[in-house]
Amino acid sequence: IRLSLVGSEMCIRDRYTHVCFLPVAEYLNEEMNGYSTLGYFAVTHRIGGSDAFKKLVDDCHNAGIGVIMDWNGAYFGTEAKGLYDFDGADAYGYLKPSLEKHPEWDVVTFDYKKGAVRSFLLSSVLMWLNDYHIDGIRIDGVASMLYLDYGKQPGTWTPNMYGGNENLDAIEFLKTMNKCIAKRGDGCFTIAEESSGWFGVTAADNDDPLMFTYKQNNCWTKDFLEFMGTDPLFRKGEYDKLTYGMLYNYGEDFMLSLN
């Protein structure tokens, strides 16, 4: 409750329009900050459970602050209490080192070919929107969903039917999910955290987009924070950090954030 009051008051004071929460679905692995999801339909006990989170969202809405939550549909952990070997086999995915630069992250990538997997993930997203009145879903790790060779070494991955490295099943899942959320007509939106430069994340002037509402502009965030961290005496030669984003601004529907 104190978090609700303090958080909403701070947002009003600093004139924020939305807040984005780190993953609130239950997890065990503290090192991954909640991105190795254990329970896709359960609020983590760290914030007090379901009722406490509903109170937090309601307080934000009453203060005129929209609520966005991070959601991970790219991979899950190997904890025995979670989805790993759920039925004694690979019910939800298959093992792959999807984050090669962090070999200690033992994760399983979802197999989007399976109808049960697509239904499970879509049901999870809709549950957060319906039951907790979340305004927006930020999909984390979209790049790792889009590429079959993400984080893999040559010779350790299998190309798609066309010989490419695109994960065609994941692409179709993302399109279906975004279209389903858009059809709700209640203003809910999706944000892609996509770092590979994939063309066509949003519908802005793209022929075959993934249909995300927005793409998070991580480059702008990095440049802006670097500029603000520069001593004012030396900012004269750093203004290009504030204007560079206009070179690609109209290629996607970007969202600017300090996340």
Predicted regions and their residues:
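Single conserved hydrophobic/aromatic residue that forms the stacking wall/gate
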Residues: 1-7, 11-12
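Short acidic/polar active-site loop segments enriched in Thr and Asp
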Residues: 17-19, 135
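Conserved, mostly hydrophobic/aromatic
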Residues: 21, 40, 60, 121, ...
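Active-site beta-loop-alpha junctions enriched in small/polar residues
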Residues: 24-26, 72-76, 142-144, 195-197, ...
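Aromatic- and acidic-residue-enriched carbohydrate-binding clefts of CAZyme catalytic domains
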Residues: 25-63, 77-116, 124, 143-168, ...
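Hydrophobic beta-strand scaffold residues
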Residues: 64-67, 190
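Switch/coupling sub-region of P-loop NTPases
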Residues: 115-136
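Conserved alpha/beta catalytic core and glycan-binding cleft of carbohydrate-active enzymes
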Residues: 133-135, 150-259
